[in-house]
Structures are given as C-alpha cells and as structure tokens.
Amino acid sequence: QGEVIIAGKNLRTEYEEAKQKVALVSEKLSYFMDKTPLENGELLGVYFERWSMEELYLWLDRLEIPKGQPIYQFSKGMYMKYQLAFAMSYQPEFLLLDEPTAGFDPVFRKDFTGIIQDIRDREIGVLMSTHIISDIDQIADYIMLIDDGELKFSKTREALGNHSIQELIEQCGHKKTTVRDLLRRE
C-alpha cells in the first residue's frame, strides 16, 4: 500500500521520468551476456539521458573489471561489481542495491563499504536490502526492517542506541524481503 515518490516523480504514474533518476543493482538483472562491459555500455547507454562512457571506464577501472571479457565469463561477485559500474555510469540520484554483496569475497566486501560511502558523499541516495548485517552496520545512517511487506521498524542509526541491528531483527522474526519484492507490490 502507498506510493513511491522519487525526486518528486510518482513511480507508478511517472515511471519513465523516475527511472532516469534511479539505478538498480540486483543479481536478477541481465545484460547482453555474450558482450563485454564496454559493448553493453555502448548498446544500453543510449536508454539513459545522463549516460557517460567516461564514467563507465572510470568505474570499470576502480572496481577492477576486465573491459574485454564477455560478461558470461564473470563470477557472481564480478557480475555484481559490473552492475554497480553500469549503474553509476548513468549518474543516478538514487541507487537501489538488492543484496549487492552476494558473491563478493571478504576482501572486496570491505572495499565495498568505502565505495558506498564515496557514492553517498556524491549526495546519491542509497537504499540497500541485505541479510548481511555487517554490511549495513558500517554504512547505514537510517535502518528499516520490512518483514513480509510490513514495516517493523524505521530508525536512524543513532536512535538504535546500544541495541544492535541484529538484536532488533531477531526480535521481529524477520523474513527476507528484497528491493525487487517491494517494487513488485501494488
């Protein structure tokens, strides 16, 4: 129930305008798997008003993604990194991350925290769904728990006080809900 308003645009009634402002990273997205990251950028970038191949190059370098390798050869973690690079290349105002660290090795998971902080420093809003509490413990400034479509709590990180996020989640008997699940609800 309710509406989703993004940068003043109703997601249901002004979808085309809203989608230009939002990037989604989810393991369920697909690209031209037989193409390279750069080829995908050239083919798909035309659908985004603020697309920048220069940004794609910068993000591919930053995330150490091979530019000339077909995407089907990527590991799950590399595929998620590519999605982040692609998403940032159309310079969104909001970034929706659906289980973004799935498949990341422990070393990159640590780097990911810094990357998300850099994105937030650019004043890009970040909404992340995850079941890995350590991911949000370090970077979240506002935490919401949605259990089977129902909002269980919504608090600033500071308002949690001495309570851990894990503690609150366990008290609610949480079931996993992804960003994609939320966007499907009418």
Predicted regions and their residues:
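ABC-family P-loop ATPase nucleotide-binding domains
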Residues: 26-82
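Helical segment within the ABC ATPase nucleotide-binding domain
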Residues: 109-122
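A short, surface-exposed alpha-helical micro-motif characterized by mixed small hydrophobic
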Residues: 136-138
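Catalytic Walker B motif of ABC-type/P-loop ATPase nucleotide-binding domains
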Residues: 95-99, 104
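Conserved ABC transporter NBD signature motif
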Residues: 1-13, 17-18, 155
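H-loop/switch region of ABC-family ATPase nucleotide-binding domains
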Residues: 130-131
